Design a protein with these regions (language model features):
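Short, high-confidence coil segments that cap the C-terminus of an alpha-helix
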Residues: 50, 113-115, 202
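Conserved acetyl-CoA binding element of GNAT-fold acetyltransferases
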Residues: 79-91, 226-236
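Conserved active-site alpha-helix within GNAT-family acetyltransferase domains
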Residues: 112-116, 122-140
Length: 241
């Protein structure tokens, strides 16, 4: 077995292992508006700008471990962090200690880059807890009926729908992150991952105050008479309303 960083010429094997491990089917690609070649092309920046280590059996990629370089607000101080993702192994190579080796090598590389924190979305909390991670936040989903929402609000500004790459929208997130503990600052890689599986009918609405200054946004999808809110942030009570 050989361990080494992945290069752009490993993109086919990288993409194949991701699709196999996370069960991304042709139907999933079609429903999200992607084609396989487009997904593969979109992953080139990851291999260029992220730290991806793979384990090879000869010329065959058996396992991989990716770390995205990001920044995070932790109690008002900005830290460089490594966001762990694309952790996957073909089943015939599991139980051989490969992932443990990839994890150690990746964490050692993070340490050399002065990234003191490693973050991830665990598919198994007990598994990663045994390896030293702990929960820093929870995700709670709410189902709200339209009649439960206040119809009269005191918000003198205006709401405008904008494009996904609107600069005011992305700057709003950075402004929010500067004052919010536990919030990541999104760089280009993070924004690409944020949108990767969203449907084309997903919208971004930005609230502007009377001075035409953006104060909050909502990312949402309306489907089958239901509104799904992916993300909502606001800088003040006016924007919240």
């Amino acid at each position: 077995m050989t361990y080494r960083p992945l290069r752009t010429d490993d993109i086919d094997q990288y993409n194949d292992l991701l699709r196999y491990s996370f069960q991304i089917t042709e139907q999933d690609l079609a429903e999200s508006g992607w084609k396989n070649d487009e997904i593969k092309q979109s992953k080139f920046p990851v291999l260029d700008r992220a730290d991806v280590i793979g384990c090879f059996d000869g010329q065959t990629l058996a396992s991989q471990f990716a770390v995205y370089p990001l920044k995070m607000n932790i109690y008002g101080q900005v830290y460089a962090v490594g966001f762990v993702t694309s952790v996957c192994t073909y089943p015939e190579y599991s139980g051989k200690g490969i992932m443990k080796q990839l994890m150690y090598r990746s964490l050692a590389h993070m340490r050399s880059k002065h990234e003191p924190f490693a973050l991830l979305y665990p598919y198994s909390i007990p598994l990663y807890r045994r390896r030293g991670w702990e929960i820093i936040s929870n995700k709670i989903s709410y189902i709200v009926k339209d009649r439960q929402i206040t119809s009269s609000v005191n918000a003198p500004g205006m709401v405008h729908r904008v494009e996904w790459d609107d600069q005011a929208f992305m700057n709003l997130h950075n402004t929010f992150a500067q004052t919010t503990h536990g919030c990541l600052f999104r760089n280009s890689i993070a924004w690409e991952e944020y949108w990767r599986w969203e449907k084309d009918d997903t919208f971004v609405a930005v609230y502007y105050d009377t001075n035409h200054s953006p104060q909050g946004y909502m990312v949402y999808l309306v489907e089958a008479d239901k509104m799904y809110i992916k993300e909502m942030i606001y800088l003040n009570r006016e924007a919240q309303e």
